[in-house]
Amino acid sequence: MSFEEAKAKLEAAGQTHVLQFWDELSAEERGTFLEEISQLQPDELVEHCREAAASASRHSSADGRLDARMQPVPPEFIGSVRKSDRETLQKWENEGLLQISQDRVAVLLLAGGQGTRLGVSYPKGMYNVGLPSGKTLYQIQAERIQKVQELANVRHGCRCTVPWYIMTSEFTLGPTEKFFKDNKYFGLCPSNVVMFEQRMIPAVGFDGKIILEKKNKIAMAPDGNGGLYRSLVDNKILADMERRNVEFLHVYCVDNILVKMADPVFIGFCVTNGADCGAKVVEKAYPAEPVGVVCRVDGVYQVIEYSEIQPETAELRGSGGELVFSAGNICNHFFTRSFLRDVAEKFESKLKQHVAIKKVPFVDGEGNLVKPTKPNGIKMEKFVFDVFQFSKKFVAFEVLREEEFSPLKNADGAPLDTPTTARRSLLAQHYRWILAAGGSFLDEQNKPFTPKHSTAQIEDPPAVCEISPLVSYFGEGLEMLLNQKNLKSPFILDENEAKNLVHTV
């Protein structure tokens, strides 16, 4: 792109100030700047800047009018681990493993965010929460994929593949690619790990003007996890899924240490019910818990953010004392490939733009970098769950929080969602698995611990124990290894230890 072409494009969008420092730039700086500007589409840019300014003013005057239009998800559209018998859960698991065995299931990771709130500059998936093994979130997830493939292979006598699609951003793609290469893709075939980058869009001032973060660089931000749908087309991911005959997709966020990759029970539940779109939910812990609620508004399924619900609505209870709006969203979804194609081709442009008012560093009229002390800019983003409204058959699946949801969002010192709470959640789960398998722990005097099945994030489990996902996906196969075994803390059950235990049975 030439300077004249860039100028014409920006004039058409009413953003000529972007080139105000052109005469001060080196040839190299001009080249990279023109490359960035070439990615912008004038029509989209005009609409984006106009909508950002308008949305910011609406955002400041938002009210709770949604409350009167909200309805909970009808019981017939909610499956539940807690309320289902073992036979039903087994039926769903069998169906899920069948679909996996036929190479019809893939997983897609939303990994565009950095670990800023954790106090690190690298992608969250590279974070080590302090497990005895030292494993990162990426490694845990990769090993769960390997194990669920193995479970399907053994059940159906085949050799299947669960492709792993990873949506990154400008900030996370490079480090993530290097991390996977350096770690030999954690045992997965590199051709089955497909990374792609979501779109970046300009940050805009309250006056509707694009913000410059440098003299030759526009302040850009990822377009939210709802940018997935456009990225699936832009990066030919839907075409890749079709080539692989993938029909069902499990989509999740990177920061949940308990996530079950391609969960056969969830996949089986959705497929059995003929769903084109599904969401895992957990029962809200308390009315004001800061999680979105899956519900219906004017008869259409969607997620309402906790900040949009008035306290009196959040506190509504049913005849049994349960919260009426209890289905907490955990960013853990099921989609059919055909539904994703419909969204990408027909509905993506209709997705709601959510406003985030942020402090955006910028260069002033003199070219000096300014780090604002109060919010000065607007970042627009779309959310992955805003497609529920387009579903022809939506279902929700309630899972147990202690088994499936422990997000990593904040640095230690915060009350919730920290490396410590994530670590405790996983270790407590593994402690419960060992007790359920008939194992027990000895203290330093070789006396048995008193079993304690109920463990919480506020304390460490009575014994430190970690089970590799390569040994057990959701607690299966442990009884033959651990029944009537006396173990000492810390105990790490990896593949080598499992082989040793088999030889002592």
Curated annotation (Swiss-Prot):
GO terms for biological process, alphabetical: UDP-N-acetylglucosamine biosynthetic process
SUPFAM superfamilies attached to this UniProt entry: Nucleotide-diphospho-sugar transferases
Enzyme Commission no: 2.7.7.-
Entry-linked Pfam families: UDPGP (PF01704)
Binding-site list for UTP: 110-113, 124, 198, 224, 255, 379
GO molecular function annotations of the record: UDP-N-acetylglucosamine diphosphorylase activity
Keywords noted in UniProt: Nucleotidyltransferase, Transferase
Keyword 4Fe-4S: no
Classification via Gene3D superfamilies: 2.10.10.100, Spore Coat Polysaccharide Biosynthesis Protein SpsA, Chain A
Motif Substrate binding, residue numbers: 110-113, 305-306
Record carries keyword ATP-binding: no
Top-rank taxon: Eukaryota
Disulfide bonds: none
Protein residues bound to substrate: 225, 409
Family, per entry: Belongs to the UDPGP type 1 family.
Name the UniProt record assigns to this protein: UDP-N-acetylhexosamine pyrophosphorylase-like protein 1
Taxonomic source organism: Danio rerio (Zebrafish)
